């Protein structure tokens, strides 16, 4: 087992090395290939055509050859933006490779569209796309790059729009902590590629164009993606710079949308929208909730919050209720603020007694609320200062009344365990009010939001100190009275005799600490000032640097403290004994002053660390090391350690702290305005909220508002229906505004791109056009027998630019990029070392890991959708048709109001018992079904001559057959029987006469004739002269004209699904050859498609709902069976083949239909088949089906292709049908029979429903918390 494991590891390592070191094999270009690549580089279309016509298929020429830079002719055409050359190369079946990615990288839109259509036409289901199948050693792009990702990297709006309209999807990255099998395998196989693929995916998701096109709420998407990138930035610190850059891009996009808000209404809608269901739904004209701005503050979107438009809106809300305040002078503003501050008790009482009065409403204004709360807090700080200065005692001493002096003396005797004084009682009341306010804030915001604000942490710490002070004072009172009442001990004695940890001393320490934090809270209040605010932000940043510094400083302090304490503790004990030689509790400072001073320096680890800390400020001298009984070596070693500590701490660490603080201040000063506005906005938003209007300590008093809530008098709650309608209105209004902003943003970005000056690409394009024109003129002159000497010699000097010369030199001199031959041989012959670490990793990997709380495989399966890198043209057309359908529904929203009531009752008799309003509602909800029923009823009544019945779509998307009833079906059968009899007479005459118009060859020679016809386009041939006369038969109603490829045959009933719809009759001049003749210029494929579609555009019926294509038009109903076929009718299928590239010279047709049964041998049972055949069978084919066909589809036909074939079709066929077949029957077939026969169409892809995104059509796929809502397609 061990040997097998080791061999597997060696094989895996060997394959990985082979992959990593795999290089493209050196290939020496022939002279023809060199000329071919140079002609493509110069844009020489005639030269390229000539080489392709002369040498394609020979050993001297390979159309897929590459230049030394590993560029094929197709990539060269894309880089030079030569569309005609690209089309020619595609027509000659060049390998596409990663040309689509190159076109996207070059931002060549026309090439992208053409290559997307090529991929859709030639790609087989289950096979890799062309850029995925390319050799990784030769590819320019990594494996994880898809067209949509690359287009997002280029941030090209137009290409992204094309791909998203086609339904292309983006492979979503899994969560960074995902532990599914796919992520674990990818991480173990190649961790670098795994991380880079994640970076590429997030770089695509961060593209502004992709967010604008794919997200219904771009601002929310930008916020959430920025927060996730911040998390990735912390978890994958190796790629911190990349994630930081992407995060900055996303933040800039969200902020740039604010630049395009033109009115206050747009800005209010943008900032007040709440994407989560809530009871408070904002509408225009109501009090602003600013939910989106709160979300921006929560996600730390500082540039978004500090935007001038946002700040203007916040300032307008902040100074609401004080008109003209901002235009007053500073002295007048100060007077107004003082008046408001001094009157805060009056306003508070008004609000408590009458919450709905004018004074109470005025107090709810944000600025007034801020002034009242600030003045209340200032009064609390005044009380703290009065308690610290012992104002009561000083007042008693100044007044010096006898009773006051007596009271003061008694208080000093009973200071331990005394009750709080009047100022302390007021402070305790304030503390209770402040704690109550903090609890309300914690309840409303939640624990997470409360902790995120650092000033709430400061409030929590100060309140904890105050609570400790109150508890310690209560404990001291209990202890004192316990000793006094129960133990009979006098607890009152001077302070110097108290225990070191007496509760009174502990309470004073806690009160002092709480006082410090309370005064520091003023910094937060001063952040509203434009001068003090930036300083407060800088101070906060420096505190973070100090905390980082103290982590290292504490480590150094503890290390040297342990060392010095180990050296000097014994000698410190000797000094202590000298100090306390008289009494253990009394120090002899008179005789042993030095010993009493220095013994504490190194007595224990705590004292040693304190000494080293104060040594940083120069408060410890070297005399402290002259301890009693210390030895010279010990003193020297201690001094050496103290010196080392001083160098590391004072010179290195302290200067590093100064440098860090300077750097932080420099960073803050560069963006001081943004940081300050963000901090000020946080302060403003805290006063915009409802509640907390009354400042402390009045918030402890019950008010009328609270009493009404307690007694049950609440506002009437909104119903769910009302909430849902309000949410829909808010969502609709927000969508309209966001569409406007996104459209303005994209327009501005496109204009900014177009405003660039002349670039190098423009010069290259002009040079390419001039070069192509030169060679075209030379070709024209040569074809007209002009004397053009030395064309080849002159063409070699076309590339006069530096890049052109370098490229030509490399091609002509066979320059190759690769290993030096000797070095490559040495590397291949060197012995690979044994990989011990991989074996060790396999042994460790056998251990079972702890089972986590999350099943990552289940999460990945749940959040995974089928990937479609490029989508399809069908999806793009469906999107446009859905928009048209949606617009039509909106325009006809009230159509049911004018509908005839009688017709409604006839349509549904149950409507006679309901009111008119109910009938109108029924019409609105059932309009689609009523319209479909009307169309079906019209089809059942019968169509005009030559018009087949339309087949409705079933749930699976296939067309169901509708059998026409009544006498129309009998007439069709009689006409079909007469037509078969006439055709049989024609066949017998043709077989007897042996005219050139029929097949006079035996059946065995049929195959050879077919191959010959495939290689050479057939010439226009006239039908047999012995055909039926004009008066013999009438055409079958709805059957259409006879098929041009089989004038003497009738198709089997089951063959309608296997053949293309008959092409409409065209003029003789419209016939196009299947392939260009030598020396002629081939028409590009796109032009051929355009010409083909323009011919059939007029005959297309209107599209049905959902953008489903209509069936192919049939021939006119007045076409007669004996009419001669026009040459264009026979050539139309050939032109279609040449255009779509669906046939190749070396491919053979095969299928159950070969050889076809002649119509002349039809038995009476065939009449039953024709009866079952529907008039619209030939119209079921869509015009676009021929584009999707491939040559191999005929052999790969699935049983589902015959699902419309009825069970009785095979039973009606008699056993003697094949036996009665005559040799002359096969003679009647023309060579064009097999030529015109086309393979079955590929299965259609599922259509996207109305309102459904392309990602939702394929199912949801693996995505993280944020990026799962990205590709939801709403434009």
UniProtKB/Swiss-Prot annotation:
The C-terminus interacts with a PDZ domain of inaD to form the core of the inaD signaling complex. Other members of the complex include norpA (PLC), inaC (PKC), and possibly trpl, ninaC, Fkbp59, calmodulin and rhodopsin. Forms homomultimers and heteromultimers with trpl. Interaction with trpl is mediated in part by the N-terminal region and the transmembrane domains. Also interacts, though to a lower extent, with Trpgamma. InterPro entries: Ankyrin_rpt, Ankyrin_rpt-contain_sf, Ion_trans_dom, TRP_dom, TRPC_channel. Phosphorylated by inaC. Keywords: ANK repeat, Calcium, Calcium channel, Calcium transport, Calmodulin-binding, Cell membrane, Cell projection, Ion channel, Ion transport, Membrane, Olfaction, Repeat, Sensory transduction, Transmembrane, Transmembrane helix, Transport, Vision. Belongs to the transient receptor (TC 1.A.4) family. STrpC subfamily. Residues 1002-1022, 1080-1098, 1144-1239 have a biased composition (Basic and acidic residues). Residues 955-964, 972-982, 1033-1049, 1099-1118 have a biased composition (Low complexity). SMART domains: ANK, TRP_2. NCBIfam families: trp. Residues 1-366, 440-450, 563-609, 659-1275 are cytoplasmic. The chain crosses the membrane at residues 367-387, 419-439, 451-471, 542-562, 610-630, 638-658. ANK repeats lie at residues 69-98, 143-172. It is a multi-pass membrane protein. Pfam families: Ank, Ank_2, Ion_trans, TRP_2. Gene3D superfamilies: Ankyrin repeat-containing domain. Expressed predominantly in the rhabdomeres of photoreceptor cells. Expressed in the third antennal segment and in the olfactory segment at approximately 70 hours after puparium formation during antennal development. GO terms for biological process: calcium ion transmembrane transport; calcium ion transport; cellular response to anoxia; detection of light stimulus involved in sensory perception; detection of light stimulus involved in visual perception; inorganic cation transmembrane transport; mitochondrion organization; olfactory learning. A light-sensitive calcium channel that is required for inositide-mediated Ca(2+) entry in the retina during phospholipase C (PLC)-mediated phototransduction. Ca(2+) influx may then feed back and inhibit PLC, thereby facilitating phosphatidylinositol 4,5 bisphosphate (PIP2) recycling. Trp and trpl act together in the light response, though it is unclear whether as heteromultimers or as distinct units, and are activated by fatty acids and metabolic stress. Also required for olfactory adaptation and may be involved in olfactory system development. One of its GO terms (molecular function) is inositol 1,4,5 trisphosphate binding. Residues 388-418, 472-541, 631-637 are extracellular. It comes from the Eukaryota. GO terms for cellular component: cation channel complex; inaD signaling complex; membrane; plasma membrane; rhabdomere; rhabdomere microvillus membrane. Residues 933-1275 are annotated as: Disordered. This is Transient receptor potential protein. It is found in: Cell membrane; Cell projection, Rhabdomere membrane.
């Amino acid at each position: 087992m061990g040997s097998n494991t080791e061999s597997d590891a060696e094989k895996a390592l060997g394959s990985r090395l082979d992959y990593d070191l795999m290089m493209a094999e050196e290939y020496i270009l022939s002279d023809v290939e060199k000329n071919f690549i140079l002609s493509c580089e110069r844009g020489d279309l005639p030269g390229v055509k000539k080489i392709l016509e002369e040498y394609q298929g020979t050993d001297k020429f390979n159309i897929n050859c590459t230049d030394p830079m590993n560029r094929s002719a197709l990539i060269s055409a894309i880089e030079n933006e030569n569309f005609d050359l690209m089309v020619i190369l595609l027509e000659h079946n060049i390998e596409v490779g990663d040309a689509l990615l190159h076109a996207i990288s070059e931002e060549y839109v026309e090439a992208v569209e053409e290559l997307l259509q090529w991929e859709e036409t030639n790609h087989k289901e289950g096979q890799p796309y062309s850029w995925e199948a390319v050799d990784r050693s030769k590819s320019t792009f990594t494996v994880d790059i898809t067209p949509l990702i690359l287009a997002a990297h280029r941030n090209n709006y137009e290409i992204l729009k094309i791909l998203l309209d086609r339904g292309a999807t983006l492979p979503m990255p899994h969560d960074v902590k995902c532990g599914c099998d796919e992520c674990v395998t990818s991480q173990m196989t190649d961790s670098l590629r795994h991380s880079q693929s994640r970076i590429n995916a997030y770089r695509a998701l961060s593209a502004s164009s992709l967010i604008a096109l794919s997200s219904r709420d771009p601002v929310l998407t930008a916020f959430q993606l920025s927060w996730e990138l911040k998390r990735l930035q912390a978890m994958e610190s190796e790629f911190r710079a990349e994630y930081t850059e992407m995060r900055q891009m996303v933040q800039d996009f969200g902020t740039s949308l604010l630049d395009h808000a033109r009115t206050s209404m747009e800005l209010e809608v943008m900032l007040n929208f709440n994407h989560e269901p809530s009871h408070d739904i904002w509408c225009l004209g109501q009090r602003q909730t600013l939910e989106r701005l709160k979300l921006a503050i929560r996600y730390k979107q500082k540039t978004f919050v500090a935007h001038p438009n946002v700040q203007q809106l916040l300032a307008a809300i902040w100074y609401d209720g004080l008109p003209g305040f901002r235009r007053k002078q500073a002295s007048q503003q100060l007077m107004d603020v003082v008046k408001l501050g001094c009157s805060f008790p009056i306003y508070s009482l008004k609000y408590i007694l009458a919450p709905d009065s004018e004074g109470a409403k005025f107090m709810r204004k944000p600025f007034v609320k801020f002034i009242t709360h600030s003045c209340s807090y200032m009064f609390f700080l005044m009380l703290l200062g009065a308690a610290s200065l012992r104002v009561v005692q000083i007042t008693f001493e100044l007044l010096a009344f006898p009773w006051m002096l007596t009271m003061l003396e008694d208080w000093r005797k009973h200071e331990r365990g005394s009750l709080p004084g009047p100022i302390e009682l007021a402070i305790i009341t304030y503390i209770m009010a402040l704690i109550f306010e903090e609890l309300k804030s914690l309840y409303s915001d939640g624990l997470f939001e409360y902790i995120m604000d650092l000033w709430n942490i400061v409030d929590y710490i100060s309140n904890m100190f105050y609570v400790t002070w109150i508890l310690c004072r209560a404990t001291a009172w209990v202890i004192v009275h316990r000793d006094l009442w129960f133990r009979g001990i006098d607890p009152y004695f001077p302070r110097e005799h108290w225990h070191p940890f007496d509760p009174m001393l502990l309470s004073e320490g806690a009160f002092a600490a709480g006082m410090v934090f309370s005064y520091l809270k003023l910094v937060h209040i001063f952040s509203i000032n434009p001068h003090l605010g930036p300083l407060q932000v800088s101070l906060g940043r420096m505190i973070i640097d100090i905390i980082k510094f103290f982590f290292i400083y504490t480590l150094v302090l503890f290390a040297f403290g342990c060392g010095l304490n180990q050296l000097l503790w014994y000698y410190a004990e000797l000094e202590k004994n000298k100090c306390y030689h008289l009494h253990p509790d009394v120090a002899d400072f008179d005789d042993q002053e030095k010993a009493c001073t220095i013994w504490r320096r190194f007595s224990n680890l705590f004292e040693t660390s304190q000494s080293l800390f104060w040594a940083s400020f120069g408060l410890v001298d070297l005399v402290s090391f002259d301890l009693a009984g210390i030895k010279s070596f010990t003193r020297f070693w201690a001094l050496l350690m103290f010196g080392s500590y001083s160098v590391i701490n004072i010179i290195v660490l302290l200067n590093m702290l100064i440098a860090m603080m300077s750097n932080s201040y420099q960073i803050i000063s560069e963006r001081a305005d943004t940081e300050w506005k963000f901090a000020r906005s946080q302060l403003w938003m805290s006063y915009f909220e409802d509640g907390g209007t009354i400042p402390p300590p009045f918030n402890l008093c019950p008010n009328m508002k609270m009493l009404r809530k307690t007694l049950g008098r609440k506002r009437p709650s909104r119903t769910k229906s009302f909430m849902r309608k309000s949410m829909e209105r808010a969502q609709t209004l927000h969508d309209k505004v966001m569409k406007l902003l996104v459209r303005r943003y994209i327009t501005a970005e496109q204009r900014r791109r177009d405003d660039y000056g002349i670039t190098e690409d423009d010069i290259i394009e002009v040079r390419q056009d001039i070069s192509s024109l030169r060679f075209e003129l030379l070709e024209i002159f040569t074809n007209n027998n002009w004397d053009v000497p030395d064309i080849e010699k002159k063409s070699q000097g076309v590339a006069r630019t530096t890049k052109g010369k370098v490229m030509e030199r490399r091609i002509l001199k066979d320059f190759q990029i690769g290993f030096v031959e000797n070095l490559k041989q040495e590397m291949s012959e060197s012995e690979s070392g044994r990989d011990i670490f991989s074996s060790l990793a396999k042994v460790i990997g056998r251990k079972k890991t702890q089972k986590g709380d999350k099943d990552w495989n289940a999460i990945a399966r749940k959040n995974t959708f089928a990937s479609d890198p490029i989508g399809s043209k069908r999806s793009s057309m469906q999107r446009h048709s859905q928009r048209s359908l949606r617009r039509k529904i909106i325009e006809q929203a009230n159509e049911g109001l004018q509908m005839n009531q009688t017709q409604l009752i006839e349509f549904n008799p149950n409507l006679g018992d309901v009111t008119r309003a109910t009938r109108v509602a029924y019409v609105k909800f059932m309009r689609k079904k009523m319209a479909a029923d009307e169309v079906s009823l019209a089809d059942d009544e019968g169509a005009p001559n030559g018009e087949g019945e339309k087949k409705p779509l079933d749930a699976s998307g296939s067309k169901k057959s509708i059998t026409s009833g009544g006498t129309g079906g009998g007439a069709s059968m009689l006409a079909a029987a007469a037509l078969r009899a006439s055709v049989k007479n024609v066949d017998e005459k043709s077989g007897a006469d042996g005219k050139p118009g029929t097949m006079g060859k035996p059946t065995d020679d049929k195959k050879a004739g077919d191959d010959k016809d495939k290689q050479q386009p057939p010439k226009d041939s006239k039908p047999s002269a012995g055909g039926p006369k004009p008066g013999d038969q009438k055409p079958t109603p709805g059957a259409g004209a006879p098929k041009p490829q089989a004038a003497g045959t009738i198709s089997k009933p089951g063959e309608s699904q296997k053949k293309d719809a008959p092409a409409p009759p065209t003029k003789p001049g419209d016939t196009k050859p299947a392939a260009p003749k030598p020396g002629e210029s081939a028409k590009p494929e796109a032009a051929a498609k355009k010409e083909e579609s323009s011919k059939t555009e007029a005959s297309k019926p209107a599209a049905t709902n959902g953008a489903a294509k209509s069936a192919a038009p049939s021939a006119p109903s007045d076409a007669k069976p004996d009419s001669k076929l026009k040459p264009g009718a026979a050539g139309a299928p050939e032109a279609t083949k040449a255009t779509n590239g669906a046939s190749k010279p070396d491919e053979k047709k095969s299928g159950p239909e070969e050889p076809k049964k002649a119509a002349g041998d039809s038995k009476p049972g065939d009449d039953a088949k024709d009866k079952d055949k529907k008039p619209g069978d030939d119209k079921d084919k869509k015009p676009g089906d021929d584009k999707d066909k491939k040559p191999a589809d005929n052999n790969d036909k699935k049983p589902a292709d015959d699902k419309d074939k009825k069970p009785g079709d095979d039973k009606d066929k008699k056993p003697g049908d094949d036996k009665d077949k005559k040799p002359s029957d096969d003679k009647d077939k023309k060579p064009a029979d097999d030529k015109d026969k086309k393979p079955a169409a590929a299965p259609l892809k599922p259509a996207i429903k109305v309102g459904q995104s392309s990602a939702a059509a394929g199912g949801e796929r693996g995505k993280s918390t944020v990026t799962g809502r990205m590709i939801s397609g709403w434009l």
